[in-house]
Amino acid sequence: MRIFFLTFFLTFFLASVLSTTAFAGTPGEVGIGGYLRETTLDGLNGSSRKLSYFKGKPLIINVWASWCGPCRAEMASLERLAQRYNGNEFNVIGISTDDYRNKATAFIKQTGITFANFLDHRLLLENMLGANTIPLTIFVDADGRVLKKIRGAYAWDSPENIEAIGEVFHIKLKH
């Protein structure tokens, strides 16, 4: 009987580990409902910060690269969203996956982006966020728990998307 329970436990344990690994998009990815791990963010248009700096308020993280056409297309709408809510209801940050800092900073300057952007040259955040495709936008609650991940470019400041953001964060946003 002992051998049966031991075999059952090991089989269940291995099945759960293998299924988790098989469906992970990137190594070390934090899935929906998981909590982001602490890491230092390398500032592109401002100071470097620890990820925990943004705790206490919902957070929208957009993963992008200067060479990515869809990323470039949605960046202006993210800027308008960030300016409209000005960190009052939530914060917006960008994570560049560019290989070269100068490419990312040139894009930020060219487009006039003012919300905080960081460089992920060691791919820690790209892996943690599951950014195997970009653009990727992640919604994180005030405690650092991942609520939703959306792949693809969107007009984030549209009335429909503002309403959807409010629903994800369980807050009422004015259009």
Positions of the model-derived regions?
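Positively charged n-region of N-terminal signal peptides that target proteins for export
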Residues: M1-F4
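Bacterial N-terminal signal peptides
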Residues: T7-S19
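N-terminal "domain-start" segment that seeds a small globular fold
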Residues: F23-L51
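Short pre-active-site segment immediately N-terminal to redox-active cysteine/selenocysteine motifs
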Residues: K57-L59, V63-W67, T133
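Alpha/beta-hydrolase fold active-site loops
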Residues: P58-L59, F90, P135, R145
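Conserved redox-active cysteine motifs that mediate thiol-disulfide chemistry
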Residues: V63-R80
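Thiol-based oxidoreductase modules, predominantly thioredoxin-like and allied folds used
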Residues: E89-R101, F115-R122
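Thiol/disulfide oxidoreductase modules built on the thioredoxin-like
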Residues: A106-I113, D120-A164
